[in-house]
Regions:
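C-terminal catalytic lobe of FAD-dependent flavoproteins
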Residues: 26, 115-116, 125, 137-140, ...
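Short, glycine-/Ser/Thr-/acidic-enriched flexible segments
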Residues: 29, 52, 75, 79-81, ...
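General small-molecule cofactor/ligand-binding pocket signal
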Residues: 8-11, 44-46, 163-165
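Helical element adjacent to the flavin cofactor pocket in flavoenzyme catalytic cores
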Residues: 20-72, 76
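Flavin-dependent oxidoreductases
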Residues: 54-124
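Short, solvent-exposed loop/turn elements at beta->coil junctions and helix N-caps
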Residues: 12, 51-52, 166-170
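Helix-loop-beta segment of a Rossmann-like dinucleotide-binding subdomain
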Residues: 7-38, 133-134, 194
């Protein structure tokens, strides 16, 4: 409330067992596909074009189909690809999480369970998206993560019909704040955006 947010503490509204929740009103359920579908009207997008190398002196981006010259370059490749400038390998780590989509409408709102291996719940069309079971990328552990997520969902929400499942890999900063701005002090007109800590669209 000190930040101007309209919020309240609620009991038994969140779709989690014995949950006390912080409820924030007037939130927007953002559909990224609808947003992206409007972008080509404003500028031209070249898909399936892989950036292989960046010439930071001459502002050239080499791709599999040719070379692109620009006045300014923004490196928004999820994980920064220009090395060794910026020393991002020392500033970032990667985290893997999992999502399943189910046919059933299990929640009317968006919820996030703030605990280790907690769930996120998000309505999508006539069904629901469940996410969670995060771990540091490359450290799988003993049990399959999709199976663990499915077990958690069925334990809390009963029998559900799973339609899709996928994994996401996010870039994390050590202080929890995204990085946006100059790629490195010694590089002119080259910028970076990275480290959204799983809050990409929110940022």
């Amino acid at each position: 409330r000190s930040l101007g947010a309209d919020c309240e503490i609620v009991q038994n509204e969140a779709p989690f067992e014995k949950a006390t929740a912080l409820k924030m009103t007037e939130q927007y359920l953002f559909d990224p596909l609808k947003f992206l579908s409007s972008l080509p009207v404003e500028f031209e997008i070249y898909e399936n074009t892989r950036a292989i190398k960046v010439d930071v002196v001459n502002k050239l981006v080499y791709t599999g189909g040719g070379c692109v010259k620009a006045k300014k370059i923004i490196v928004a490749t999820h994980y920064p690809i220009i090395n060794p400038h910026g020393n991002y390998i020392m500033k970032l780590r990667q985290s893997t999480s999992y999502t399943i989509a189910v046919k059933e409408k299990c929640s009317q709102g968006m919820w996030l369970e703030e605990r280790a291996e907690g769930l996120s719940v998000r309505p999508f069309r006539e069904g629901t998206l469940f996410g969670g079971i995060d771990h540091r990328t490359g450290r799988i552990g003993k049990y399959g993560k999709f199976e663990k997520l499915t077990e958690r969902v069925k334990t809390q929400f009963g029998s559900v019909n799973i339609t899709n499942c996928w994994a996401a890999q996010d870039v994390m900063t050590f202080d929890g704040m995204p990085m946006a701005g100059k790629y490195a002090k010694n590089l002119k007109d080259i910028y970076v955006v990275t480290g959204f800590n799983k809050w990409g669209m929110t940022n």
